[in-house]
């Protein structure tokens, strides 16, 4: 249920912000949390106003760390427009966020906030309850341009510099229970594990290496605990009920947000090019290889390639082929084991499409992707010639 309120040249009294003045702002009520806190959307920002005392742990550069005096937390889409870069209101990111907090009617000293390039209308909100305990996740996210794997090569070093790459997964996690600061920190670990689990279950690839993504390069998280609650917990790990609720809630919300923002979901991932993107295999790379065999119009080729890319047999065998390569790169299988299994898979794919198989010369990313690409091209070429 939404609460649309048009505000024009009038003073507006909000929870904890009685002296705030807004002009021309539209407020939409998104959700009321079990804590009594309320989430609103103000155009390109989502603000959660606290009804009482809260413990907050934030990874944000702006007023991050552990605090017990905050009145609200927020998430802001900094893009000027769709597909455009984020607008900077000051020379530093911290000052930019301070100015932004004032613009949306907050007291900068009493809030923490996160910036993103994700659209606020694509927010996903999930909540789970066990007995008296409720956990709520408010998530925006997109990793198509900035998804990476921890340990990937990086180009950002200066402590005061703000990376300009976009595509963050921002999480506001609200725990309707009191807890010591250490447990709040443990909840952050569990929350991060859940985010990574969601991404890996979608087999989203890194944009900076051949690995599976574990997040984006600029993910941020805010954890909120209810200091006023009679419930008091000292555990938020995977063996605790709170940890279970955090895991399930965050995983579901992250998947929903990625689907809304980027179209990243099981349906779109049912395509070999989506799975092979991290290995630099694309329709364009296949087209360049195909041109050496047949003179066919590119639109006709692309239609045939996309159709083949989504066929169950091609996707299933290719998925196994990719996982062999992953396990080789992780040191779990040696070259002989991978060579033997990969050649069998290439032969099986060829047999399914009545095409001559391709020999695999060595086990490496380049060699395995070359062999697969040549086989894929041969299948398309043979199909065209048969028809």
Roles of regions detected by a PLM:
Residues 2-5:
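Position-driven detector of the extreme protein N-terminus
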Residues 7-387:
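Alpha/propeptide regions of enzymes that mature by internal proteolysis
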């Amino acid at each position: 249920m939404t609460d649309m309120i048009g505000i024009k040249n009038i003073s507006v009294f909000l929870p904890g912000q009685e002296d705030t003045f807004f002009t021309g702002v539209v407020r939409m009520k998104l959700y009321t949390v079990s804590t009594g806190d309320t989430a609103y959307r103000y155009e390109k920002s989502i603000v959660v106003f606290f009804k009482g005392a809260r413990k907050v742990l934030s990874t944000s550069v702006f007023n991050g760390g552990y605090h017990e005096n905050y009145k609200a937390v927020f998430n802001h889409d900094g893009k000027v427009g769709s597909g455009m870069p984020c607008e900077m209101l000051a020379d530093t990111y911290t000052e930019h966020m301070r100015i932004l907090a004032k613009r949306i009617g907050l007291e900068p000293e009493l809030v923490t906030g996160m910036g993103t390039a994700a659209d606020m209308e694509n927010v996903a909100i999930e909540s789970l309850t066990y007995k008296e305990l409720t956990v709520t996740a408010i998530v925006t996210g997109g990793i198509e341009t900035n998804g990476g794997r921890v340990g990937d090569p990086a180009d950002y070093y200066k402590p005061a510099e703000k990376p300009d790459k976009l595509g963050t997964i921002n999480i506001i996690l609200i725990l309707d229970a009191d807890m010591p600061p250490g447990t709040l920190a443990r909840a952050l670990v569990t929350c991060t594990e859940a985010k990574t689990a969601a991404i890996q279950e979608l087999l989203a690839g890194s944009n900076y290496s051949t690995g599976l993504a574990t997040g984006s390069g600029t993910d941020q998280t805010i954890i909120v605990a209810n200091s006023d609650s009679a419930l008091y917990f000292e555990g938020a790990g995977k063996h605790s009920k709170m940890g279970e609720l955090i895991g399930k809630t965050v995983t579901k919300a992250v998947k929903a947000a990625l689907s809304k923002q980027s179209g990243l979901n099981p349906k779109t991932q049912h395509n070999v090019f989506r799975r092979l993107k991290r290995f630099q295999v694309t329709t364009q790379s296949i087209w360049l290889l195909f041109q050496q065999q047949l003179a066919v119009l590119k639109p006709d080729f692309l239609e045939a390639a996309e159709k083949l890319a989504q066929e169950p047999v091609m996707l299933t065998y290719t998925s196994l082929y990719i996982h062999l390569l992953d396990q080789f790169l992780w040191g779990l299988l040696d070259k002989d084991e991978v060579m033997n299994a990969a050649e069998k898979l290439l032969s099986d794919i060829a047999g399914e499409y009545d095409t001559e198989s391709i020999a695999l010369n060595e086990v490496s990313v380049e060699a395995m992707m070359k062999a697969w690409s040549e086989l894929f091209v041969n299948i398309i070429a043979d199909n065209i010639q048969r028809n």
